[in-house]
Amino acid sequence: MDEAGFRNFTVNFGPQHPAAHGVLRLVLELDGEVVERADPHIGLLHRGTEKLIEYRTYLQALPYFDRLDYVAPMNQEHAFCLAIEKLLQMPVPRRGQLIRVLFCEIGRLLSHLLNITTQALDIGALTPPLWGFEEREKLMVFYERASGARMHANYFRVGGVHQDLPEKLLDDIWNFCEPFLKVCNDLEELLSYNRIFKQRNVDVGVISLDEAWTRGFSGVMVRGSGAAWDLRKAQPYECYDELQFDIPVGKHGDCYDRYLIRMEEMRQSVRIMKQCLEKLSSVDGKGPIIEQNHKVTPPRRSEMKRSMEALIQHFKLYTEGHHVPAGEVYAAVEAPKGEFGVYLISDGSNIPYRCKIRAPSFAHLQAIDFLSHKHMLADVSAIIGSLDIVFGEIDR
């Protein structure tokens, strides 16, 4: 049969596929086992989050952010709180800032642990998830002890955090740090120099720095291609400008470089956590956890039991909510997956006029056709794993 008699065939990758990382439906056009075209179909987890936020007070809108990147929920809350605080021109007390940074770095560990171990699982390594999830369980217990919830924390508030940390939690997080670094070394021993792991990741899903910028990449995806771009250093927020940490940068822009960067970022996160713990334990770190602006923050429970005015004020804040001055603002944080941004427009009322969410995974997923072109079908799993996508924030 001549060449014209052959044609490419199309297969569905997902949404049931275990390596699709959620509800991704990828329509692949294959020439034999070589990918000619990859067409992502998204929207299977769409809940209309941005529209729902327009019908909620600022406090009621906060829990929606936990459900975007549900692997590291507090990082998303952080961006929303920063946006509101910019419009209100509201400072955050020192202790509140340190607690926020501490739990954002715990979120980074949660996200990178899940990504590294499932990326290994996607290409056939079964041991890393068993080791990684043991550590994630400990971190989720820290989340639970601080906020009362393992995943959807709803812990950050405009002006600070909801409640102070319980006794002994700081000591327990400190005691977690050193053994965790040993687990990182063990994981790296399993994967970094493993011949099969390298064959499956090196020179797969390569993207140049110029191409990464053009496609709107951020986070690990641009650092893997050679740019030392991290919002915690480039545009410091909270107390990141006081903290000492390094930005790992790759050279080749492939799946293996992105894996190595996430591995090193976990060590840097532990370094940041230790500095936060030291500062929280010092005299400087003592004090209020939330700004005492009673137009925005509710009175303490002890006050409510004694004062009728405090009770009325609490009732007003939790029913009507607080008003935010008219204006528009963009606030972004360095989430584990990249630059997570919130573009907020206020009309001066108690509900947002518009809240646009900039999800890093969305920009990364749209490059799947470019990244997987002319690769083998088996490489698609490795590429999706290295993108670190979560469909809560892609579909919103």
UniProtKB/Swiss-Prot annotation:
Catalytic activity: a quinone + NADH + 5 H(+)(in) = a quinol + NAD(+) + 4 H(+)(out)
Protein name: NADH-quinone oxidoreductase subunit D 2
Recorded superkingdom: Bacteria
Quaternary data: NDH-1 is composed of 14 different subunits. Subunits NuoB, C, D, E, F, and G constitute the peripheral sector of the complex.
Role this protein plays: NDH-1 shuttles electrons from NADH, via FMN and iron-sulfur (Fe-S) centers, to quinones in the respiratory chain. The immediate electron acceptor for the enzyme in this species is believed to be ubiquinone. Couples the redox reaction to proton translocation (for every two electrons transferred, four hydrogen ions are translocated across the cytoplasmic membrane), and thus conserves the redox energy in a proton gradient.
Family to which the UniProt record says this protein belongs: Belongs to the complex I 49 kDa subunit family.
Cleaved signal peptide residues: none
Record membrane topology: Peripheral membrane protein
NCBIfam families found in the cross-reference section: NuoD, PRK06075.1
PROSITE patterns named among the record's database cross-references: COMPLEX1_49K
GO molecular function: NAD binding; NADH:ubiquinone reductase (non-electrogenic) activity; quinone binding
Keywords: Cell inner membrane, Cell membrane, Membrane, NAD, Plasmid, Quinone, Translocase, Transport, Ubiquinone
InterPro entries attached to this UniProt entry: NADH_Q_OxRdtase_suD, NADH_UbQ_OxRdtase_49kDa_CS, NDH1_su_D/H, NiFe-Hase_large
Localization annotation: Cell inner membrane
GO annotations of cellular component type: plasma membrane
Enzyme Commission code(s) on record: 7.1.1.-
Gene transcribed to yield this protein: nuoD2
Chief place of localization: membrane
Pfam families named among the record's database cross-references: Complex1_49kDa (PF00346)
